Amino acid sequence: LLMSLHWLDAVEHIVVRTFEHAQKYDVRVTFAEARSRRAAHALARLPGVQAVEPYRATPVRYRFGRRERREVLVGAVAEPRLDVVLDAHDTPVALAENGLTMSTKLAELLGAKLGDVVTIEVLEGRRPVLRAPITSMFETYLGTPSYMRLSTLNGLMREGPRISGAYILADSAYFDPLNRALKNTPMVAGAAFRSAIINSFRETLADTINFMVGFYILFAGTLAFGVTYNSARISLSERGRELASLRVLGFSTLEIS
């Protein structure tokens, strides 16, 4: 029962670490296609926007030895503030100028370690094949993310300063007009508000956690009943043997009772 209730604390820890300590933006905007940095300046002029941080999400296939993984490589600014990469101690991880910052889980799946050079097959645009060392690693509870400096990624792809979206920090009083403005912006393919993501995350796990808690409560109740019943049967059996022994010794039923 205590183990089942521990899941609630674990989920809350994931929510706080992921959606408060690491992801500090209010809206994640995705463009219909990669655009120039001017698109970020256009977002900064929308209602209630306080800060804009561009990123580039590129589909890639990682290869290391005989292993490969299809993932998304995120190009981030040199010192991200709205979507921060954290280590196990919640300390921001610096993105090296020339190299990959990879989750430990992804590195494990590839069989790679810190300092290994990984082949990166880009699956969009000119589809270049790149090679980059793993310069830093970090722990994460969700997914198998990987990062590279935005300027480095754009340089390797030889496409100039391009971005595929942006993180927005906004005044909560302007969320509704901001949402309407984003829906009316042709270059925007989607806008995900962090509050909606958190609610969806909680709702997705709620049914599973409630089922697990209910199962463990039922299991604990059944186990407690079984232990109590078994103890009562043993006690009754021992009492019966004691009474039988007294009868053998010559005591009458009245004397035993």
Where in this protein do the model-derived segments appear?
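Alpha-helical transmembrane segments of bacterial inner-membrane membrane proteins
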Residues: 1-257
